[in-house]
């Protein structure tokens, strides 16, 4: 079983810290995988973390870490991350399931799970 932290949270939500690179790194260091929200800036190829909008500029190297699951929040971020074989990403809005770039089924809360979920 893989334990996946949501935006770095491991003991309930902390909206002031979630998606901050230091908060994410702390969860990774504790042995969790982490789902992060990633936004893309058009034309520059740069990426940022944040739930409702880009908040923290981030480099590709950070996102290449084992255990990070990148939730692309827009087509720009998904396109740019999908070109990097070392970044694990997926995109969905209200879909029951999304296929990640590493072949996992990302299933929304309360949806049926499979051996690939």
Cite the ranges covered by each PLM segment:
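Phosphate-group recognition and catalysis centered on beta-loop-alpha active-site segments
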Residues: 1-117
